[in-house]
Curated annotation (Swiss-Prot):
Biological process, per Gene Ontology: mRNA 3'-splice site recognition; mRNA splicing, via spliceosome; RNA splicing
GO cellular component: cytoplasm; nuclear speck; spliceosomal complex
Subunit (UniProt): Component of pre-catalytic, catalytic and post-catalytic spliceosomes. Associates with the spliceosome prior to recognition of the 3'-splice site for step II, probably during catalysis of step I.
Bias type Low complexity, positions: 441-456, 470-480
Species this chain originates from: Drosophila melanogaster (Fruit fly)
Annotated zinc fingers (CCHC-type), start-end: 116-133
Residue ranges of the region described as Disordered: 1-64, 78-100, 252-274, 433-574
Modified-residue entries (Phosphoserine), positions: S207
Record family assignment: Belongs to the SLU7 family.
Domain of life: Eukaryota
Compositional bias ranges of the Polar residues kind: 1-14
Protein name from the UniProt record: Pre-mRNA-splicing factor Slu7
Chain positions with Phosphotyrosine modification: Y216
PANTHER family the UniProt entry points to: PRE-MRNA-SPLICING FACTOR SLU7, STEP II SPLICING FACTOR SLU7
Name of the coding gene: Slu7
C-alpha cells in the first residue's frame, strides 16, 4: 500500500457546512480524477514528480504506506501530513526547570480568621486534620487576633507525571551549606577537647591513636553476620572465598542437574567418590528432613486404612486422620505390652527386664585411670583391649607362630618354618621353595626360564596300541569256528557251554577296546591343543600331584600387574 490521495474527513465536512452555501456540496471524484491521482502517485515513486509537502514544508516519502500517511478523521488535518506519527515534545515541557516556591508565604501576614481555614492555626491552605502544628490552647477560630502565614500553593494543573514525583523540586542547594557548617562546628569542638587532653596527659596520644582504628568497628555490621528479615536476601547471596559453587563440583554437562533459580543440586555430582570422602553429596537429604517422614507415614496409614474400608483422606480430613493414627498407635502399643506381660507370666524372667535405661548405663562410672606422659598407667586399672572374635595364639602342627605371620611374593605363611601351606607340619627354620630364586639376579632367572619351560611342557608318551584290524579279524574268525562245530551232532552240549564262554570273552574284549580307543582320542585332543592350556592350573584336579616350581621374575611381575588391588596386604597401611 502506498500513500494515496487525501480524503476530507467527516468532521471537516461537518464544520465547513455552515461556511459553505446550501447549493455547494462535496463532489464525487470521477474516474478521470482517480486515474490522475494514481499517475501522480506513480510519478512521485519513480522520482519524476516532486514529493508531497506537509504543513511544515518537509517532504513526505512517497513509499510510506497509506495506512501510515493518512491521518485519522478525528485529527482534523486539511492536507498531507505526518504530524500524527511524530511525538509532540512541546506539550511535554513542564515546570521542572522552574522553581516553585515552597514553605510559608512570609510576604503576607494574616491577622483574622477566615472562613474555611484551619481551626487550629488559621492557615487557609490546609484543614485541621492536616495541621502539623501542636494543638493550641486557644484555637485560631476562637481567638480575637492571630498572626499566621499561608503556604505557597503549586499549580497542580500544569504539573505532569515527572514533576509530580520530583523530590528535588524547588530545592535550593545553598541550604546544604547549613549542614556543612554544623558538622564543622562539631569537628572543631572535638579538636579542642583533644588538645586539652594532650595538655593534661602527653602520653595519652599513643593510646588514643591506637584506639581510633577500631573505635567504630563494633557498630558496623559485617556481611553475613546481621540477621534481619529485610536483609536475608543479601545475606543469602554471600559466600566465603574458600567455598566452592555446587555447579563447579563436576564440570561434566551430563552430571547432576543444577537449578539456578533455587540454587539447588539434588543429585550427587560425583557418584563415583565414596560418601565418607566426598565434600558435597547433593541436597537430597533436605527432602527427608523436618516433617517429611511424618507426612509420608500419615499418607501410608491413610492408604492402608482406605484399603481396609475406613473412609479417610489425608488432604480432605487431616484432623480425623491424625486422631485415627494416634488411636491406632496406642492400641498397637497396648497389644505389644499385653503380649509381653503374657509371655513373662507364662515363662518367667521378669527380673531380667528390670534394667536401668541405656542412657544411664554408660553415662557415668566410678572407674578412675591416671596415665603418665609416656602412656603408662599410674592409677587405676587399665581397660582391657578389645579382642578378636576368633581364637588367638593357637599353634597347630608343631608351629610356634600363627598362620599369616610370614608374607613373601604375594603369599602368606608361617614365620617359624617359612611354609606357605596352611595345614603343613613344622620342620624348623628353612628357606621356602623358590625363596632364593625370587631374590636372585635377572640374568640367572632368564637363563633358567627356558629349561624350566621345556620341562613343564613335556607331553607324556603314549604306549603303542594294538591295531583295530587284528581285533576285527580275531572277532570274525571266532564265530566262523563256532559255526563249524555246531554241525557235529555229538558235541551239542559242549558247544552250548563253549558258546557262552566265547560270548563273555568277546564282550569283555570289546569293552577293553572301547576304553583304549577313548584314551587315544583324549590324548590326540591334548596334543592338538596349545601346550600352556594343558598346564592350566585352574583345570587340574584338587588332589593331583602337580609339580610346583618357583616362578621366575617375569612371571612374578606379570602376576603383580594382574593382581587386584584388594588383595594387596599393605593396602590397609596406606
Amino acid at each position: 500500500m502506498s500513500s494515496g490521495p487525501m480524503r476530507t474527513p467527516v468532521s471537516q465536512i461537518i464544520l465547513s457546512k455552515h461556511d459553505q452555501d446550501a447549493e455547494e456540496e462535496p463532489k464525487k471524484k470521477s474516474r478521470e480524477d482517480w486515474r490522475k491521482a494514481k499517475e501522480l502517485e506513480e510519478a512521485r515513486k519513480a522520482g519524476t514528480a516532486p514529493a508531497a509537502v506537509d504543513e511544515e514544508g518537509r517532504d513526505i516519502n512517497p513509499h510510506i504506506p497509506q495506512y501510515i500517511s493518512n491521518a485519522p478523521w478525528y485529527y482534523g488535518s486539511a492536507g498531507p501530513t505526518l504530524k500524527h506519527q511524530r511525538p509532540q515534545h512541546e506539550d511535554e515541557q513542564g515546570q521542572l526547570d522552574k522553581r516553585a516556591p515552597k514553605g510559608l508565604n512570609t510576604a503576607r501576614i494574616i491577622t483574622k480568621f477566615r472562613k474555611g481555614a484551619c481551626e487550629n492555626c488559621g492557615a487557609v491552605t490546609h484543614k485541621r486534620k492536616d495541621c502539623l502544628e501542636r494543638p493550641r490552647k486557644v484555637q485560631a477560630k476562637y481567638a480575637e487576633s492571630i498572626v499566621v502565614h499561608d503556604e505557597h500553593l503549586v499549580n497542580e494543573a500544569a504539573v505532569n507525571y515527572d514533576e509530580k514525583r520530583d523530590r528535588w523540586s524547588s530545592y535550593d542547594p545553598a541550604n546544604h551549606r547549613e549542614i556543612i557548617e554544623e558538622y564543622e562546628k562539631v569537628e572543631e569542638a572535638k579538636r579542642q577537647l583533644k588538645a586539652e587532653k594532650l595538655k593534661n596527659d602527653p602520653d595519652a596520644e599513643i593510646s588514643d591513636e591506637e584506639g581510633n582504628e577500631d573505635k567504630y568497628v563494633d557498630e558496623v555490621d559485617m556481611p553475613g553476620t546481621k540477621v534481619d528479615s529485610k536483609q536475608r536476601i543479601t545475606v543469602r547471596n554471600l559466600r566465603i572465598r574458600e567455598d566452592t559453587a555446587k555447579y563447579l563440583r563436576n564440570l561434566d554437562p551430563n552430571s547432576a542437574y543444577y537449578d539456578p533459580k533455587t540454587r539447588s543440586m539434588r543429585d550427587n555430582p560425583n557418584p563415583a567418590v565414596p560418601e565418607e570422602e566426598a565434600e558435597f553429596a547433593g541436597e537430597n537429604f533436605v527432602r527427608f528432613s523436618g516433617d517429611t517422614t511424618a507426612q509420608a507415614t500419615a499418607q501410608l496409614f491413610a492408604w492402608e486404612a482406605h484399603g481396609k474400608g475406613v473412609d479417610v483422606h489425608l488432604l480432605a480430613e487431616p484432623t480425623k486422620l491424625e486422631l485415627l493414627q494416634k488411636e491406632y498407635e496406642q492400641k498397637k502399643e497396648q497389644f505389644k505390652s499385653s503380649t509381653k506381660t503374657h509371655i513373662v507370666e507364662k515363662y518367667g524372667g521378669e527380673e531380667h527386664l528390670q534394667v536401668p535405661p541405656k542412657s544411664l548405663l554408660l553415662a557415668q562410672t566410678e572407674e578412675y585411670i591416671e596415665y603418665s606422659r609416656s602412656g603408662k598407667v599410674i592409677k587405676g586399672v587399665e581397660k582391657p583391649k578389645a579382642r578378636s572374635i576368633y581364637e588367638e595364639d593357637v599353634y597347630i602342627n608343631n608351629h610356634t607362630t600363627v598362620w599369616g605371620s610370614f608374607w613373601n611374593a604375594g603369599r602368606w605363611g608361617y614365620k617359624c618354618c617359612k611354609s606357605f601351606i596352611k595345614n603343613s607340619y613344622c620342620v624348623g627354620m628353612q628357606e621356602p621353595e623358590g625363596y632364593s630364586e625370587h631374590h636372585s639376579t635377572s640374568s640367572t632367572a632368564a637363563a633358567t626360564t627356558e629349561p624350566a619351560a621345556q620341562s613343564q611342557f613335556k607331553v607324556p608318551e603314549v604306549p603303542p596300541e594294538r591295531p583295530t584290524s587284528e581285533v576285527d579279524s580275531a572277532s570274525s574268525s571266532e564265530p566262523s569256528s563256532s559255526e563249524e562245530e555246531e554241525v557235529k551232532p555229538e558235541k551239542k552240549k559242549t558247544k552250548k557251554k563253549s558258546k557262552k564262554r566265547e560270548k563273555k570273552k568277546k564282550a569283555k574284549e570289546q569293552r577293553k577296546q572301547k576304553g583304549k580307543n577313548k584314551e587315544t582320542k583324549d590324548k590326540d585332543k591334548t596334543k592338538e591343543k596349545d601346550i600352556p592350556e594343558e598346564l592350566d592350573d585352574r583345570k587340574r584336579a584338587y588332589n593331583s600331584m602337580y609339580d610346583v616350581k618357583a616362578p621366575t621374575e617375569d612371571e612374578i611381575e606379570e602376576w603383580k600387574k594382574k593382581r587386584p588391588r584388594a588383595e594387596d596386604p599393605m593396602l590397609q597401611f596406606m
